[in-house]
Design a protein with these regions (language model features):
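P-loop NTPase motor domains
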Residues: 1-134, 197
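Conserved ATP-driven motor cores of ASCE-family P-loop NTPases powering translocation/secretion/packaging/pilus
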Residues: 130-201
Length: 201
């Protein structure tokens, strides 16, 4: 499919009776993913399985994106593939361990730095992070969100974060985002406004 040229994609759309523009858009977007060296034609989940084995043994895994650090599509693709597998595995294991605490999966913390890149309103619905924040505490998975601009994070996801730790915020929208859904917000807002650099509340 990815090797087809524009005319061949249009012909395929007619053959399988789908919207030509929709198929062309899909074709173009998939071809863009093909430029990432980690996307290969052969089907394999070895890397994901190895990461899951590390997590099972309690070994920390840090994903660095190196040359792809400015490629949002690479972040979203990898984060989605990996976290969906983690979510699925932890839900299954929690269900299988129902009533047997010894079989529950090892607690896991998924940390997202620069979270607004993954959790903005336009992107959060395309990822599983909202589900993880909302549902996975009962499956021993916790989402740790780290960001200097919490106002860039989807309101639904922010509302699901149980514990919030904040350093000095100088933007009102960021303060409002941290305060949303917090009891005693007025008093805490006063404390936040008086924080020195490197202090937290």
């Amino acid at each position: 499919f990815l090797d087809l040229d524009g005319q061949e994609v249009r012909e395929l759309a007619g053959t399988i009776n789908v919207n030509e523009r929709a198929l062309s858009t899909l074709h173009n977007r998939l071809r863009r993913l093909g430029r990432f060296h980690f996307v290969t034609e052969r089907e394999s989940d070895e890397s994901v399985e190895e990461i899951l084995r590390y997590l099972d043994r309690g070994i920390h895994v840090v994903l660095e994106f190196g040359r792809y650090q400015n490629e949002l599509a690479a972040y979203i693709l990898v984060a989605n593939l990996l976290t969906r597998r983690i979510h699925s595995r932890y839900v299954t294991r929690s269900d299988e361990a129902m009533g047997d605490a010894a079989r529950k999966p090892r607690p896991l913390v998924i940390t997202i730095e620069e979270a607004h890149r993954f959790l903005s309103s336009s992107i959060a619905s395309q990822t599983i992070f909202g589900n993880i924040a909302r549902e996975d505490r009962k499956h021993n998975v916790t989402l740790l969100v780290v960001d200097q601009r919490p106002s860039g994070i989807d309101d639904e996801v922010m509302s699901q974060l149980g514990t919030k730790l904040s350093c000095l915020l100088d933007n009102e929208r960021d303060v409002d985002a941290v305060m949303a859904g917090v009891s005693g917000a007025r008093e805490l807002r006063s404390v936040l406004s008086k924080l020195e650099s490197k202090q937290q509340a």
